[in-house]
């Protein structure tokens, strides 16, 4: 029989059980002890999941790794809410953007510059910056009536969705008491209701 000795190394915005460096060291330590190490992440480890950093760290220390991709929450969570990220005649493309980074000013500039894109945009880890994200989109030329949705608890009993527009989504989310983690979706696909 297999036995496991799990270490919970969750990372939520503002709440980290360990720093990334400590996680890297723990992975290396357990691997060097001869353990079969499984680093299980929600979503895809290479979409803002630091999976690449962890694999490079292990490989640079002589540890062989095997990666098994997951399904990113950028696609899975909207799908669970009945929102396809692409849909014929509505959205031919989609982009995934982090909503949280050390250099938020340059991120807002990127968001402003991307406002001319006609496709769907999904923001991960951006709930605390929702007002600034929507403001950057509008100041970049995106119409205020562009549909927007915020989804939390995509796969558990805390699931909730709030829909609105760039003009009112931040207020609606605040009034609904939506908390992180959440996925933000902007674009006409928000009005497609598959549920």
Model feature map: region roles:
Residues 11-15, 100-101:
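Short beta->alpha junction loops
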Residues 26-33, 38-39, 50-55:
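Ligand-binding beta-strand-loop-alpha-helix segment within the catalytic cores
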Residues 14-32:
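Short phosphate-binding loop-to-helix
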Residues 1-6, 10:
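Single conserved hydrophobic/aromatic residue that forms the stacking wall/gate
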Residues 42-117, 160-164:
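Class I SAM-dependent methyltransferase SAM-binding "motif I" and its flanking Rossmann-like core
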Residues 22, 32-37, 93, 101-195:
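A contiguous loop/helix-start segment that scaffolds small-molecule binding in enzyme catalytic cores
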Residues 13, 43-46, 155-156:
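Short histidine/acidic/glycine/proline-rich micro-motifs that form metal-
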């Amino acid at each position: 029989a297999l036995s496991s000795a799990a270490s919970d190394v969750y990372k939520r915005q503002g709440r980290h059980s360990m720093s990334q460096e400590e996680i890297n060291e723990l992975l290396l330590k357990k691997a060097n002890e001869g353990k079969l190490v499984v680093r299980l992440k929600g979503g895809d480890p290479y979409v803002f999941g630091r999976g690449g950093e962890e694999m490079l760290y292990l490989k640079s220390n002589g540890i062989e790794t095997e990666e098994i991709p997951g399904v990113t929450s950028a696609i899975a969570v909207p799908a669970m809410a009945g929102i396809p990220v692409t849909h014929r005649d509505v959205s031919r493309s989609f982009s995934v953007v982090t909503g949280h980074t050390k250099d938020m000013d340059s991120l807002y500039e990127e968001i402003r510059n991307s406002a001319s894109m006609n496709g769907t945009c999904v923001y991960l880890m951006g709930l605390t910056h929702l007002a600034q994200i929507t403001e950057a989109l509008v100041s970049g030329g995106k119409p205020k009536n562009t549909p927007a949705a915020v989804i939390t608890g995509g796969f558990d009993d805390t699931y909730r969705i709030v829909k609105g527009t760039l003009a009112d989504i931040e207020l609606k989310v605040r009034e609904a008491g939506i908390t992180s983690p959440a996925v933000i979706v902007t674009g006409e696909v928000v009005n497609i209701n598959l549920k």
